[in-house]
């Protein structure tokens, strides 16, 4: 099988897609990335993975595998405390001590 077919299989069968929403620092909430994460992870683990993949460490985060950037322009800040991740129909906010469900 070719790589594109295997990638599509992963996205449909093996992985979930979560949305990363920047709203910290007074930002108007806006989706900055869609991140592919393993389906078998707990929701908070999916949030952790999305957080890690949307932080620039050695390279710009939007160049990471499993990340689809959704922002306009040349760049975007890293995900921070106060930002959110949408997993299925549940939205989580990044707190200083983990993830809290947004009601």
Can you describe what each PLM-predicted range is?
Residues 1-64:
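N-terminal non-globular leader segments, chiefly Sec-dependent signal peptides
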